[in-house]
Amino acid sequence: MESASPSATIRRRGVMLVLSSPSGAGKSTIARSLLENDHEFELSVSVTTRPRRPSEIEGVHYHFKTQRDFEMMRDGGDLLEWAEVHGNCYGTPRGPVERAIAGGRDMLFDIDWQGAAQLREKMPDDIVSVFILPPTMKELLARLTRRAEDTPEIIERRLRNAHHEIEQWRDYDYVVINDDLDRAFASVRAIVSAERLRHERRPGLEDFVAGLLAERPE
């Protein structure tokens, strides 16, 4: 039986990977591919006051809360970030994220720039943020239209919002232009691989290097 390689056994903190983009730029598609192909990642499950849809499963899609319970979590400091969208509240529970990161497990956040800013403020040393850009606004419109999920009015609103969202690109650690989905996905995976190797995230390196220096090869 082969023993694990030294690099695989060195203790590390997890990565909090934040993916943001305007609607239609490919953020959610890349997030799904990452979860399917990289089993070190877990998707952060948000809490929400929105009513559960028939197809949704508690604890898988969301943790569904009453308004009172949500406010208690918010006021008690139990949320890393939260926002109100279309009259419903959404937030990221603090406890599961902190336990995962301390245990060396990586967490994926598919959130907008406002949520990313709140996470960056709460856990700045653990965040790796990537902003996904469309190659052109014309292509963004084409993607939104091809989805056939929204009315022309909603598509127009999404395009207007996209301008403001794209203006936040400088706040992110990395920017990936999604002109080819496979290339964009490969870029995100390369970012993740490099960030996992940062020595600041690998407290176990201290003991490994000390042991390495203490060796006396025959």
Curated annotation (Swiss-Prot):
Keyword Cell cycle part of the UniProt annotation: no
Top enzyme category: transferase
GO cellular component entries: cytosol
Principal location listed in the UniProt entry: cytoplasm
Residues annotated as domain Guanylate kinase-like: 14-193
Record-listed E.C. numbers: 2.7.4.8
Annotated binding of ATP, by residue: 21-28
SUPFAM superfamilies reported in the protein's UniProt record: P-loop containing nucleoside triphosphate hydrolases
Single GO MF annotation: ATP binding
Reaction catalyzed: GMP + ATP = GDP + ADP
Pfam families cross-referenced by the UniProt entry: Guanylate_kin
Sorted UniProt keywords: ATP-binding, Cytoplasm, Kinase, Nucleotide-binding, Transferase
Superkingdom per UniProt: Bacteria
InterPro entries assigned: GK/Ca_channel_bsu, Guanylate_kin-like_dom, Guanylate_kinase, Guanylate_kinase_CS, P-loop_NTPase
Subcellular location per the Swiss-Prot or TrEMBL entry: Cytoplasm
Matches recorded under HAMAP family: Guanylate_kinase
Biological function: Essential for recycling GMP and indirectly, cGMP.
Family: Belongs to the guanylate kinase family.
Protein name: Guanylate kinase
The organism of origin for this protein: Chelativorans sp. (strain BNC1)
